[in-house]
Design a protein with these regions (language model features):
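C-terminal substrate/ligand-recognition segments
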Residues: 653, 693-699, 746-771
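Short, conserved non-catalytic motifs in the polymerase core
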Residues: 550-552, 556, 738-747
Length: 792
């Protein structure tokens, strides 16, 4: 059986070493092509007419004036009269014109009448009164969930849990399918319990989404020696991809579509476009070269992607490009749900956690918002949790890097930090004290990571009790947080070819969204063949290549590296079989090292790589590698799941202005076998920088009167800039106990803890908790003033 296992450290030539990214030359030279750069002959410019209201019904649409304008080649009504709009900026009409000016003029010429409906865009206040229990779903509710882009898995869960008010007819199912309902949703509807008595019952915007009780909560609190109560929260924020969402579509003939799209899932887009376009998925060719980030928001072709294809069809097959302007990107391309909670948590005097009680709420837009996984990381023995999902009109929710985990970290780690302060304990000692409450898989990891992080931060010298490190108007403090994630590799297929001239090609239907996926694949292949990484010719970003999963859930590194490893080992072994007679050796006695194929026991008996490949014959060696999403007992598992990390932050707070400056952040992280330390460290640093943004600046600010976003631009929707980025130090956990686990994903974990760590550092600095992120000057000053008035 081929030796698919990852090589031991002494037999690795590239794996675990710092490698120049293989896409670096095209990026720094400006040659990298993104969706916006696709400019084929006859390119038409797509434009979306968006609804200005947060909640309304479309009464009428008149596109006649736009259709008559010179230069307008196609108009497509996306939502017909009678349709309900659930957020400002939702798409109503799309058009294509010969230039952007004409497209803008045509959009202004379209007349749409709306019936305004009541809207809600707030979510930070606790739900008024008792939340209603979720009732059975009507077919309109299901249709609304499709319009609101509620994830399929969540739709199925709600249908199964709550049932429906009426059994769907064949026509109902057909219409839902045309609206985008997948087979799991349709199957769930047909199997669901029917509750006709619930039909017509008015639905509350505040739905009791979860009530969980474990252990003897009241008894545990009554017997606890120390109890802390607090209010914590993180608002709705958006993805802010450097490259906005967009698609260029072109019909190559009447039945074949070519789509260039900015997506995190190139192999899955055709299947999503097939039903709306009434076209076999095999007739849709999806391609991309480079993607400027997605962070969970770019898995769907979206309404504008479907529109670009339909406009192209109406325009005689000419390419139509629709790219979201920055304002629309911030308004409608997805948001991270909010999460707020009143938390009461208790411990013994020695710091042993005994009880947790929380009333949480939040929104992900019209689809409501699920309960974040609280208490996070720690399985506190006695728990009571109630969550209220708020359905409002703030915009559509989408997965945001580590869905729900950053919010859970804020709610949990800040509550625990407050409890540690009440116990007069160093929070690191408090966390270490309770490591027996985390999963056994992670206990050793955290125990090893904490002292490393503390040494990097200088925690012992910098931590002081709350509010005691003051120098004039400057307060300094440190804070910490821990996090966990899965990250097992997704299903992935890889085709690898070795040619008689020595060239090596890999084809894989994955995508590189800026994370270094190309480099990861090249390093794994080159390591096994004894070649430099740039010797591998990589072809990715196309659904005509072997399928590979979407880049989400930190599943890509494990998936692509495992399928590549299997393919390259098979191809290398086939090459050894061809070469062995020339070296008077057995194939199993050969190795590929340093551009040579040689005898393991006698390196002088060798052929250069090109000489060895010349023995192949006329036809290339081809091999196929596959990684299973679920571990198989029949072959070695090259990927795994479950990581843990510790982050610490040091801040300086100006108590006159309320401005928070992060002075230093450290991150200690495991991810199994590290393919390239530079890529891994970059991912951790990127997560920490992203965390600084949502900790200090980011919030989707809404006008409660109009229901519109007030900061849909990069001037007022602020991200961390160069002057905001502090000293960043990263340590990757590698070696014995880590490498043998195989490759585990790293995209999500580093972004989970920064918000909580920075919030805890600010509380340590000024001696009082700022309840909600972002930690803006007004909130900091308000908290500081309350402390001063209390005589602290």
């Amino acid at each position: 059986m081929p030796e698919y296992n990852w090589p031991d450290p002494e037999h690795r030539t590239l794996i675990g070493r710092r490698t120049l990214r293989v896409d670096a030359p095209v990026k720094v030279s400006g040659q990298a092509k993104y969706t916006y750069d696709v400019k084929g002959p006859g390119l038409l410019f797509g434009k979306i007419l968006a609804c200005p209201y947060a909640h309304c019904k479309i009464v009428s649409i008149d596109t006649s004036a736009a259709e008559k304008m010179a230069g307008v080649k196609a108009v497509e009504i996306l939502q017909k009269p009678g349709a309900q709009i659930h957020w400002a900026g939702d798409e109503v009409v799309a058009l294509a014109a010969v230039d952007e000016g004409t497209a803008d003029d045509a959009a202004r010429a379209i007349k749409v009448k709306y019936e305004k409906l009541p809207h809600l865009v707030s979510d930070a206040e606790p739900p008024p009164g008792a939340a209603a229990s979720q009732g059975p779903l009507s077919l309109d509710d299901v249709s609304d969930m499709l319009d609101n882009q509620v994830p399929e898995r969540e739709m199925v869960s709600q249908i199964q849990q709550y049932g429906i008010t009426a059994k769907p007819s064949e026509q109902d199912l057909k219409e839902l399918k045309e609206d985008g309902a997948g087979a799991p949703v349709l199957d769930a509807l047909q199997a669901a319990a029917v509750h006709p008595e619930a039909a017509g019952r008015p639905k509350s915007r505040y739905q009791k989404a979860a009530v969980v009780t474990m252990g003897e909560v009241d008894k545990a609190f009554a017997e606890a020696e120390v109890v802390s109560e607090g209010l914590y929260g993180a608002p709705v924020i958006v993805h802010c991809c450097l490259e906005s969402h967009g698609t260029t579509s072109e019909w190559t003939d009447d039945d074949h579509l070519f789509v260039h799209v900015s997506t995190q899932g190139v192999s899955g887009i055709a299947g999503q476009m097939a039903e709306p376009l009434k076209l076999p998925a095999s007739n849709i060719h999806v391609h991309q070269d480079h993607v400027g980030g997605g962070f969970g928001s770019k898995f769907s072709p979206d309404r504008w992607g479907i529109a670009s294809a339909r406009l192209s069809k109406k325009a005689g097959g000419k390419p139509v490009r629709i790219m979201l302007e920055r304002a629309r990107e911030l308004e409608v391309a997805g948001c991270r749900p909010s999460a707020y909670a009143r938390v009461k948590v208790a411990a013994k005097k020695d710091g042993t956690l005994v009880a947790w009680d929380s009333q949480s709420w939040g929104t992900g837009g019209p689809g409501g918002g699920g309960m974040p996984p609280i208490p996070y990381v720690f399985s506190i023995p006695n728990q009571r949790k109630q969550h209220t999902a708020i359905s409002n009109n703030i915009g559509p929710a989408r997965a945001w890097r580590a869905p729900n985990h950053p919010q859970a970290a804020v709610l949990t780690m800040c509550a625990l930090d407050d409890l540690a302060a009440k116990l007069n304990m160093d929070p690191m000692e408090f966390f270490l004290k309770n490591l027996d409450l985390v999963s056994k898989q992670r206990q050793t990891t955290y125990a090893e990571e904490f002292p490393i992080a503390a040494e990097m931060m200088g925690w012992k010298d910098k931590w002081r009790p709350r509010g005691t490190n003051l120098s004039g108007n400057l307060a300094r403090g440190v804070g910490l947080s821990i996090h966990t994630w899965g990250g097992r590799g997704h299903a992935s297929d890889c085709d690898l070819s070795i040619y008689p001239d020595g060239s090596v090609e890999i084809r894989m239907g994955t995508q590189d969204i800026g994370t270094g996926t190309r480099t990861c694949i090249a390093v794994v292949a080159a390591d096994a063949l004894g070649l430099p990484a740039d010797a591998i010719k990589l072809y990715v970003g196309d659904n005509q290549y072997p399928p590979s999963g979407g880049s989400g859930g930190s599943t890509t590194p494990g998936g692509v590296s495992s399928s590549t490893r299997r393919a390259v080992v098979d191809a290398r072994d086939a090459l050894f079989t061809k070469v062995a007679p020339a070296l008077n050796a057995q194939a199993e006695d050969l190795e590929a090292v340093g551009g040579m194929v040689r005898l393991k026991s006698d390196p002088n008996r060798s052929l250069s790589w090109k000489e060895a490949c010349a023995k192949i014959g006329a036809m290339p060696i081809t091999a196929h590698g596959h990684n299973d999403q679920i571990a198989s007992k029949n072959k070695p598992d090259l990927t795994n799941s479950g990581v843990g990390g510790v982050q610490m932050a040091e801040v300086e707070v100006d108590t006159d202005t309320g401005i928070v400056k992060v002075r230093k952040m450290v991150g200690v992280q495991d991810c199994g076998l590290v393919i390239d330390p530079r890529l891994a460290e970059s991912s951790v640093m990127g997560g920490m920088i992203m965390g600084i943004s949502y900790a200090l600046y980011e919030e989707k600010v809404m006008d409660p009167t109009t229901g519109r976003m007030l900061n849909p631009n990069m001037e007022f929707y602020r991200l961390a800039g160069f002057n905001d980025i502090p000293e960043l130090k990263v340590h990757m956990m590698t070696g014995k106990g880590y490498d043998e686990r195989g490759v585990v994903g790293l995209g999500e974990p580093p972004v989970i803890s920064p918000g909580a760590a920075i919030s805890n550092a600010v509380a340590n600095a000024i001696g009082v908790r700022v309840s909600f992120l972002p930690l803006t000057p007004d909130k900091v000053l308000s908290a500081w003033d309350s402390r001063q008035k209390a005589g602290a």
